[in-house]
Each structure stands twice: as C-alpha cells, then as structure tokens.
C-alpha cells in the first residue's frame, strides 16, 4: 500500500511529528511505501536546519532524514508555513533576500498542489496532529 502522510503539529508542542515518524517506520518495515510526507503549519519546524535540540533529546529532524534517505521518501515542507517561520530553500532565500537557506538537507519546499497530488497518487492519506 502507498501512503501519503500529512503532519500538522509543531514538534515542540505536539506528538504529531513523532507519531507520524513511528507510523512511517512501521509502514516501511511492513513492506508499504510512503509516497510523500507533507509538513504543514507548525510541523514545518521539523525542517528547520537552524534548530538544535539538547544533546539528551532525540532529533526528530535526523530521524526523518534517516528514514527518508533509507526508503526514498520525499519530505516536503509547505512553502507558506515554512516562510512564515523563517525556513527557506536556496530559491526562496534569494527571493526574500535572506542571507542563506535554512531548510534541513533531505527536505524540499512545496505547495498545496503537491499535497493534493500526493493525496491522489497514494492509496491512503493519514494526517497527524491538529
């Protein structure tokens, strides 16, 4: 089965991103595929390359990066939500005249069109967070 995941919760105040990660990990272990993970609203903070968790905490960003690279999963941050929170890829950094990009490696910027495309391509869409 092919899944599309929509993650909405801020990783600092919501279980959405870690619950979505655990679901994705279990799904690929069971032989399913994850077409795309779309981070929306506060969940785009998972893609922030400038954030650094304390050394005694798990980095949700690194967990997603590893899972995505091992399983060819596309990690996409909503462009509107990301720019509101200071997260830019190279193109958006130039567009908004920012000194550098701030998106973590393995993540890309996309819009609601890509969310809809992912929903149409997947067999099931699962939403995490509120």
Description of each model-found segment:
Residues 3, 34-37, 75:
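Hydrophobic/aromatic residues located in beta-strands of well-ordered beta-sheets
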Residues 3-18, 46-52:
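Short, glycine-rich nucleotide/cofactor-binding loops
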Residues 6-8, 38-39, 79, 127-129:
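Short beta-strand segments
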Residues 17-30, 37:
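Histidine-anchored nucleotide/phosphate-binding helix
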Residues 38-48, 81:
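Short, conserved active-site loops that position catalytic residues or coordinate cofactors/metal ions
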Residues 79-130:
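N-terminal glycine-rich phosphate/adenylate-binding segment common to multiple enzyme folds
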């Amino acid at each position: 089965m092919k899944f599309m995941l929509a993650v909405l919760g801020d990783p600092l105040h919501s279980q959405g991103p870690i619950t979505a990660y655990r679901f994705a990990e279990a799904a690929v272990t069971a032989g399913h595929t994850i077409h795309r993970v779309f981070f929306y609203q506060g969940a785009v903070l998972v893609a922030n390359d400038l954030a650094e968790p304390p050394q005694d905490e798990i980095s949700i960003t690194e967990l997603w990066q590893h899972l995505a690279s091992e399983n060819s999963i596309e990690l996409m941050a909503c462009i509107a939500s990301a720019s509101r929170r200071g997260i830019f890829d190279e193109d958006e950094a130039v567009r908004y005249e920012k000194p550098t990009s701030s998106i973590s490696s393995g993540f890309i910027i996309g819009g609601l069109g890509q969310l809809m495309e992912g929903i149409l391509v997947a067999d099931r869409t699962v939403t995490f967070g509120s």
